[in-house]
């Protein structure tokens, strides 16, 4: 899980999810794409 100031979808499998006021990118196809805004 990378922590970034700006998160972007990196492939078509990436999903944008909001949890506890934070924006997360979750990707089941390529877990390297997982990101959270911090």
Curated annotation (Swiss-Prot):
Keywords: Ribonucleoprotein, Ribosomal protein. GO terms for biological process: translation. GO terms for cellular component: cytoplasm; ribonucleoprotein complex; ribosome. GO terms for molecular function: structural constituent of ribosome. Disulfide bonds: none annotated. HAMAP family: Ribosomal_bL36. Belongs to the bacterial ribosomal protein bL36 family. PANTHER family: 50S RIBOSOMAL PROTEIN L36, CHLOROPLASTIC, LARGE RIBOSOMAL SUBUNIT PROTEIN BL36C. NCBIfam families: rpmJ_bact. This is Large ribosomal subunit protein bL36. It comes from Pseudothermotoga lettingae (strain ATCC BAA-301 / DSM 14385 / NBRC 107922 / TMO).
């Amino acid at each position: 899980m990378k922590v970034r100031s700006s998160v972007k979808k990196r492939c078509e499998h990436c999903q944008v999810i909001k949890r506890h006021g934070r924006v997360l990118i979750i990707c089941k196809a390529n877990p390297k794409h997982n990101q959270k805004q911090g």
